[in-house]
Amino acid sequence: MKFFIDTADVKEIREANELGLVDGVTTNPSLIAKSGRRFEEVIKEITGIVDGPISAEVISLEHDGMIAEATELAKIHPNIVIKLPMTPEGLKATKTLYKRGIKTNVTLIFTPMQALLAAKAGATYVSPFVGRLDDISQNGMGIIQEIRTIFDNYGMDAEIIVASIRNPIHVLDSALIGADVCTIPYSVMLQLAKHPLTDAGIKKFLEDWEKVPK
């Protein structure tokens, strides 16, 4: 399973990349706003750090505007993936960009049927949001299993990016189900590496080492 980092914080991206954990990056308008920097400036810097897919989201809500934005974004770097909303206009734009050979990531997916529609329109990636479903007492990971089954049944090419990851269990469940990608906040990436018994073991080794005659 591939790990994308879900952030527009260049410092976090550099640190995660140094750990060997980053196969790609997902950004969105909210994450860019948190950075306090110009959109294009941030995206360009990220492409210089990570050699993998970089999802950059359009702001327009209608087809022609989406295509105009996508065309400009795609010029930034060959690794740019255009992030589009799961709407009828977004699906139309997905189909248009597919025909032009531009990769897409259809986002804000909350049902298996939305994922299937996006895949049929030619999406490179589909991004179901598990944490937000959990927030309203729905089974976020359940739809990942359903999407995986549907895509396998029909040989769909689109890759499943599990998004809105809140904790390490989301990542574990995604791996067990067979999702293609998890896009993970840096804080959760760090949690994946931690265990109290690891810390206790290191402490014990160091304590024992102090007893070795010098």
From Swiss-Prot:
Family matches, as SUPFAM superfamilies: Aldolase
One GO term of the biological process aspect: pentose-phosphate shunt
One Pfam family this sequence matches: TAL_FSA
Main location: cytoplasm
A single cellular component GO annotation: cytoplasm
Reaction(s) the record says it catalyses: D-sedoheptulose 7-phosphate + D-glyceraldehyde 3-phosphate = D-erythrose 4-phosphate + beta-D-fructose 6-phosphate
Protein name (database record): Probable transaldolase
Organism listed in the record: Citrifermentans bemidjiense (strain ATCC BAA-1014 / DSM 16622 / JCM 12645 / Bem)
Name of the gene this protein is made from: tal
